[in-house]
Structures are given as C-alpha cells and as structure tokens.
C-alpha cells in the first residue's frame, strides 16, 4: 500500500510540474534537407534522431524556384518562441512559421512512423499506417506535432515521403524539422513509462 502511495505521489508531482513546460528547442539535432524532386516522382526522407525527452516536433516545408532562398531558417524563427504553447494549432500559427518565400510549384506529402511503410508508399503508392496525409498540393507548410499526435509515440524518427505535383519539371523542396525537448522527460520519464509503472503497481496491489 505504501509503495502505491509513493508512486501516486511521484505521478501527481510530475503532473503539477507539467503545467509549466520547461525545455528547449534542440537546434543541434535538427533536420535540414534540400531535396531535388523529379517531375511526378516520390522521395522518402528520414528525420534526424529525436533526442530523449522530445515531446513536440515542428516541421516546415518550402517549395522554391531555382533562384529562391529561404530568408530565415526554422531554427531562427523558433528562437522567438520560448516553448510550443506559443505556437497556435490553427492557421495563424502555421502562417507565422511558414516561410515568407515560396515558388509556384507544389507537392503532396505523407508522414510515417516506420521505414517499411514509408518505402512501400514511395515505391508502390500503397498507403498504410500514415500519421499525416497531405493530399492537397501545397507550396509551403508548417506544423506542430504534439505528444498526442499519432506521429510521436516514443519513436526516434519520422519518415516523410514527398510527391511532386509538377509533371513536367523538377522541383526544389527545403525540408526542416526541429524537436522540442522537455526537461522533465529527458531521463525517460514519459507518459508511456508512467502507464507501465501504474500497471505494475496495480498488478502487485
């Protein structure tokens, strides 16, 4: 009984601390890729490994003309945002994070949590177990994925498959990903770990 009370106290304390997020945007373990995509082709990109304690991920996609360059990187934009609560889940937040520069070309993309499904989609267009599907062609996009997303379930990477919407010319895509690391979860104290510990306590009660 005492063991159970101690565990519940620790859990309660962690929930109280979670009310005021404290962490950082990891500007070292980011993904920053410039992709040249052939006309009508697909290409898979694996993100850099997410650090332990990643609870949110921001990604940005910018399709550029040959002579265009990104004016401000996603890392530099996020410096003005102290934590993910400052990013709106609505269109306003997406517009703020999205690049101010974009070209005329567009692409579609799908996000997977494992390489096998991503490769199958890239090679044969068989769509299975995707956590984000963007079927409407876009020329720029910026999104926040939270720990509640199907995309973030303790996995270290995400796999993005981009598909060109241009059937004549190749296109250039700048792809950026920045993880948010929560100090409380850096030592592996995640929601999944909490559930597992509670389950063990209930079994032994």
Q: What is the meaning of each model-derived region?
A:
Residues 19-205:
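Acidic, Ser/Thr/Pro
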Residues 1-22:
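Bacterial Sec-dependent N-terminal signal peptides
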């Amino acid at each position: 009984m005492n063991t159970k009370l101690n565990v519940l106290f620790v859990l309660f304390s962690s929930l109280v601390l979670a009310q005021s997020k404290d962490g950082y945007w990891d500007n070292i373990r980011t993904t920053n890729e410039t992709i040249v995509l052939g006309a009508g082709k697909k290409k898979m990109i694996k993100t850099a490994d997410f650090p332990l304690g990643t609870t949110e991920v921001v990604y940005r996609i910018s399709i550029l003309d040959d002579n265009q360059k990104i004016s401000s990187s996603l890392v530099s934009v996020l410096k003005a945002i102290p934590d993910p609560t400052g990013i709106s889940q609505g269109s306003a937040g997406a517009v703020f994070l999205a690049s101010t520069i974009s070209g005329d070309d567009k692409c579609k993309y799908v996000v997977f949590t494992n390489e096998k499904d991503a490769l199958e989609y890239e090679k044969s267009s068989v769509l299975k177990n995707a956590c984000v599907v963007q079927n409407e062609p876009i020329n720029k996009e910026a999104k926040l994925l939270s720990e509640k997303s199907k995309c973030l379930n303790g996995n270290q990477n995400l796999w993005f498959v981009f598909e060109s919407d241009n059937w004549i010319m190749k296109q250039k895509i700048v792809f950026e990903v920045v993880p948010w690391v929560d100090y409380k979860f850096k030592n592996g104290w995640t929601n999944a770990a909490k559930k597992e510990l509670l389950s063990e306590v209930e079994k032994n009660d």
